[in-house]
Structure formats: C-alpha cells, structure tokens
Design a protein with these regions (language model features):
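Core structural elements
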Residues: 79-85, 289-290, 472-496
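Catalytic-loop motifs flanking and including active-site residues across diverse enzymes
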Residues: 28, 32, 238, 420, ...
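Conserved catalytic cores of very large enzyme subunits
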Residues: 105-482, 503, 509-681
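Well-ordered alpha-helical scaffold segments within catalytic/enzyme domains
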Residues: 495-503
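Buried hydrophobic packing segments
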Residues: 32, 36, 242, 246, ...
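Charged, amphipathic alpha-helical regulatory modules used
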Residues: 2-119, 123, 480
Length: 684
C-alpha cells in the first residue's frame, strides 16, 4: 500500500462514520486500534504495539481519502484489510476477512428472521406503519395474516431469490422493488371476450361455469373472475372494451334501462366488497370504448356457444345503456352515498367521441363531482384504439421499439400487464453526483441494470411457479408471460434537479426541465437495450410509489441530513416521477403545457392529475376542460381531480372542509333554540 505523502498540513480525520442502518456516528480511531489488536492476538502475529502502528497507518489513509468526511463502515474495514495485507500480516488479514464474512452472513440471516411476537403485537396495537399504508385494506384478522405473511415473503425475495447486491440496493434505498410481500406478478389485463365466450372453468378440482347466456350471469362471472385472479396477482386486474363486449346481452334479451342498471349495481357493489386476501377490496379497472372500435365493428358476438344475428358495430344504443347505467350507479354511491372506489373507469376518447351527447353530459357531471374516470387520449397521442387487443396477436414483436402497455396506470390491455416494478431513487443520485451529469447517468445506468436483473429473476420464478400450478387460474387464462412487461420507474426527478444544482434549479425551470428530459431519454435507451438483450418486453412507468417516495426520503435523510426534499423533516417525501412540485400551479393548462413532453416519454403507466381546489362548476365546464386537454396536448392519460369532503351525516360536500358546515349550522340552530326556550321559561 502506498502511504500518502506527508504535507505541511495533514488531512483532517473523518468526522463521522455511516453505519449499516444509515445512521451517522462519531469517528473513533480507538475502535480501529482495538479491532486490529484483537485480530493480531487471535493469530499470534503481533501485539498491541504493532497494532497501534497499523491503526495509525489505516487512519492516515482514511484521512487522505475522506478528510473531514464520513466513510461507510464497510469502507473503513476495507482500508483495515488493505493495511494488514500491505504489512504482510497475511494470516491476520485472512482471519479478518473470514470474520467479516461470518458477520455479514449472520446479519443476513437475522434479516430473514421475523420476530413473531413483535410482528403480531405491532399490528394489533397499530404500531406498524403498514397497518394504514393501504387505503383498500382495513384493520382486520385478514389484514393481520397478510401483514405477517408479507414480511416473511419479502425476506424470502431479498435474501433467497435475488442476488445480494440487488437485496442490498433495495434495503439501502437506491431502488425500490415493489410488492415484495407477494410471491406473484404485478398487474394483468384479461380478455373479457374470452371469459364471456368460454366461461369461468378449466381448473381441475374447482367448480366450473359454462359461458353466460344472460347479463346477470355474465356479471356474476366477471365478479368471480376478477376476485379470483386478484388472489394470484399483487396489483390491478383489468378488462378492456367492457361496454362493447357486454352490449350483445342487452340486445339478445331486449333489456330495458332498469334491468341494465340493476346488473351494473350488482357488479359494482360486489367488486367493492373486501373479498381479496387480507380483507382488501379487489383492485379492478374497466375500460370503456364508448364508441365501438373499428376493428370490432364487423365481428359477430357469440353468446352461450351461438353466433348472434348482429355485429358489435350494430350495438351503439346498447352500449349507451350500459354507459348510462354504470355512470348512474357510480355517481349515486352506496346505501349511505359513499362513492365507490372500484372498478376504476377508463374512457377511450377517440376522434368520433360524441362530446355533446346526453351520456357525455352524465360522464362529465360525474367527473366534475368526484373525478373518478381516467381519460385515454386516442385523439392526439401515440396511442391507437386497437393497441388494447394487439398484444395478444402480434407474433413478431419488434424489440427495438418501446411498446406502450395500454390502458394507463392501473389498467392493462388484453392479455398483457406487468411482471414487476422497480423504481429508482433519482433524488439520491442528484445529491451524490451534484454538478456531474456524466457520473449521475453512469450511476443511474448501474441501478437500471440491477433493476433489470431483478425483473428477469422474477419473470423466471413466476413462470416456473405458474407451470407448477401455484397460479391455477392465471395458468388457465394466460399460460405464459410472453406479453407481460418488465417495468422500471423513476421517482423524485424534481428533487434530483434541486440537489444536483444545490437548490438553484428545479423541474419547473427551463434548465431543470431539459435535464429531466435527458434523463428520461437515457432510461428509454437503456431499457431498449434490455429488450434486445433479454427478448422480453420492458417499459418505463411513472410509478405511483406512494410508499416508496416516503421510504426513499427517510432513508436519505438518515444518511445526508442536508439533502433537499419535499414535505417536512418529520414527514419527508419526494415528488412522484417527473411531476411538478405539489401546489406549484392551480392552472390546469399550465400543468399540461409543462408536463406534455415529459409525460409522453413514459411507455407504461402514467397519468397527469388536473387538481381542482373544489368541484368544477358544471358538466359543460368539465367537458370543455377535458376536450381542450386531449385535443391540444399529446398526453396519453389525464384525470380530473376535484377536492371534496364526505360527512358521515350529510354525505358529499364540495371543496375541503375539516368540519361539516351543515352539521355546525344544525348545532348552532339547536343551541339557539335551547337558549330561546330557556329565556321563554324564565319569562313565564
């Protein structure tokens, strides 16, 4: 080892040490001397005097490499190893290396253990943050079972499936591997036409249903199908062209509006019952064509094994009935007026969309009030309506191009979806490589490579488990993961820009915006390479990362207290993907203009939320907002998000209200009446 050349002013010793949990501790040279002395005594190669000299040498190297800095504990131990080797104390060096390896193994084993008592008690006392992490899962026995099982499954993935460097990158917050608590794929889109034509059947030993002949039985099979498949996947389950494929039942049975509405009510209610593992509501998405797609117009539907004497293109009136009924039920809500969360509706907006129709008025009235729907832009984006079905029949996929997954953030096109999602902590990269874009992109490339490796491992494992029968219904209706994407996401690009420039720029400035575009182009180029190398589909997603964004920020603050973040020191977070900072603008068209070229870089799920401070004045205003957004901008998906409150007594209230104004008014009126009665009693 080469000793640093002495200078007039010796470098300052490191000020701190980064521990394995990310916490900072005061640098203590005595601990290095003690460790070397114990190692020398164990081998008999040297005593305390030589140990002190070796410790001084190691400290000089540390001061030279990290003057006044904060090396990681592993980096300090690396220097100690190098010092022992340079001094030719080979027996001690080998013993020290073996000791480090044993300790690393013990730490890894400890991470795979789950403390049964604390895990159960943390859930029962609600001390575990996971109890409230999922809005779709309530505090329940099923939630307890899922919580404890999820910890075991996550440790299995990180310690026994993924390579050590992948597990380490996740644990230390460089990347976030989503849905580690489930030994399954992420999300899937299914062919509703296949279900309606073949029925819910084909799994040995399970009850079988023939193809439905009426809408009521079709609705029952849809609910059972989505609920059953949800148990085999971690994320959203989706059907496309719902109104197109269900319309033949309306025509065949001559159903009136009341009958169609009853069927929609039964379906929507049953899909909001917490029937999923962990007492959760199934996460479901339905895509509505509104106007029959061109590639289906001449095709003949089959009901109960019989071809119908009409084509899908003949059923616009029936599609209108279905859309009207669905919107009516979703707008009305449950028995107490509470809005239904699922299925999330996605509407395909094509050039022939009837903006001025009565149904369109109902759709935008619902949107103005609740903001439920997602709108898929087939007017002015790269998306094409037939893409939702093209994935299952393209025999030769061009892996040199990045394909669109279709149907937005929570939906998937027919017979496709995502095997898994890995999100990169971009804010950390901006901090660590401030001012050096080449170094930042190089580090990003390494993390993307780790993400790709983890997704390839997951794809192989899930396919093998499917072949073994662990996912019987997925095996029956899908069979293989050929058309499923491996998804990579980014998080905290706004904070990446801020940290990279030490707070001088953010994503809203021209420079920061251009930097974000360069980063997304870099990611797209890398995942194109992954496609060509692996033969598997990849996409870039603006991953929601609701939990990951807080986890990233908390991990980074432990290591670097001066890192820039959103939120407060107690509740830090990073801005999702490449979104604008929270509260930056209340002008939806400014948000659209600033996000247009960023949003079009994503090939997987992405959606721009147009946040409104309160309910939009009327359906016409909402319709014009959506129309202008989709015709003037190239964003693939948007959703309107008005602010509203729900009172347990009075239900829906436009705008944000910490307390119900109607309840307050009633209490004041009651108080006044009581005072008046008291005054009258005294007067009498």
């Amino acid at each position: 080892m080469t000793t640093p050349t002495p200078s007039a002013a010796a470098p300052a010793m490191p000020a701190a040490v980064i521990q394995r949990d990310g916490q900072r501790a005061v640098f203590d040279a005595c601990r290095i001397r003690s460790a070397i002395a114990r190692a020398g005594a164990a081998t008999g190669e040297f005593g305390d005097t030589q140990a002190a000299l070796l410790a001084d040498e190691a400290c000089r190297v540390l001061a030279y490499r990290w003057p006044g800095g904060a090396p990681h504990i592993e980096q300090i131990q690396d220097v100690v190893e190098q010092t022992l080797v340079a001094a030719r104390h080979m027996a001690t060096a080998r013993a020290y290396m073996a000791y480090r390896q044993r300790r690393a193994t013990l730490r890894a084993d400890a991470q795979t253990l789950v403390d049964v008592q604390s895990s159960i008690n943390e859930y029962l006392t609600r001390a575990d943050w996971r109890v409230n992490a999922n809005a779709n899962q309530g505090y329940s026995l099923g939630g307890l079972i899922l919580n404890v099982a999820g910890k075991v499954t996550a440790n299995y993935w990180l310690s026994h499936v993924y390579a050590p460097e992948i597990g380490q990158a996740h644990r230390e917050g460089d990347i976030h591997i989503h849905d580690l608590d489930m030994l399954s794929g992420y999300c899937a889109g299914w062919s509703l036409r296949t279900l309606l034509t073949e029925g819910l059947n084909g799994v040995p030993g399970k009850v079988e249903a023939a193809p439905p002949k009426h809408m009521s039985s079709a609705v029952g099979q849809i609910v059972n199908f989505l609920g059953t498949l949800q148990n085999e996947w971690a994320g959203a389950q989706a059907f496309s062209s719902f109104d197109t494929y269900m319309a033949p039942f309306v025509r065949k049975d001559g159903m009136d509006y009341a009958a169609v509405r009853q069927c929609m009510q039964e379906m929507i209610y049953n899909l909001n019952v917490p029937s999923r593992w962990g007492t959760q509501t199934p996460f479901t998405n339905l895509t509505f064509d509104w106007v029959c797609p061109e590639d289906l117009r001449e095709q003949v539907p089959v009901i109960g094994g019989e071809e119908m004497p009409f084509a899908y293109g003949d059923l616009q009136a029936e599609m209108d009935l279905i859309n009207r009924a669905y919107i009516d039920v979703m707008t009305t809500g449950d028995a107490k007026g509470r809005v239904f969360t699922f299925p999330i509706p996605t509407y395909n907006i094509t050039p022939d969309f009837p903006w001025e129709s009565e149904n369109a008025g109902r759709l935008f009235a619902m949107t103005a009030k609740y903001g439920l729907p997602y709108f898929q832009n087939f007017i002015n984006s790269e998306l094409k309506p037939n893409m939702v079905r093209s994935m299952c029949c393209r025999l030769q996929l061009d892996l040199r191009e990045l394909l669109k997954r279709g149907n937005g953030l929570f939906g998937s096109a027919e017979q496709t979806g995502s095997v898994g999602v890995v999100t990169v902590n971009c804010a950390r990269l901006g901090y660590l490589h401030a001012g050096d874009e080449a170094a930042l992109l190089d580090a990003l490339g390494r993390l993307l490579e780790l993400g790709s490796q983890s997704l390839e491992v997951k794809r192989k494992l899930i396919q093998r488990l499917m072949d073994q029968g662990l996912f019987p219904y997925t095996r029956r209706y899908l069979g293989m993961l050929r058309n499923h994407f491996s998804t990579l996401g980014v998080n905290g690009i706004n904070e990446m820009v801020r940290n990279f420039t030490r707070g001088e720029q953010d994503i809203t400035t021209a420079w920061g915006h251009a930097f974000a575009l360069r980063l997304l182009d870099f990611v797209r180029k890398r995942i194109t390479g992954f496609q060509e190398r692996t033969g598997h589909l990849y996409n870039l997603e603006a991953s929601p990362a609701e939990g990951a964004t807080y986890r990233f920020a908390k991990e980074d603050l432990k290591r670097w207290p001066d890192i820039l973040h959103a939120g407060t020191p107690g509740k830090p977070y990073y801005t999702n993907s490449s979104q604008l900072p929270v509260g930056f603008t209340d002008d939806p068209f400014e948000a659209l203009a600033r996000q247009e070229d960023l949003q079009t870089k994503y090939t997987g799920g992405t959606v721009l939320h147009l946040y409104m401070g309160e309910r939009i004045s009327d359906a016409a205003a909402c319709r014009e907002l959506v129309r202008r957004a989709l015709t003037r901008f190239r964003l693939p998906y948007i959703t309107v998000t008005p602010t509203f409150s729900v009172c347990p007594v009075h239900g829906y209230l436009a705008g944000e209200h910490p307390y119900c104004p109607l309840c307050d008014a009633e209490k004041l009126a009651a108080k006044r009446q009581a005072i008046e009665r008291q005054q009258q009693a005294r007067a009498a």
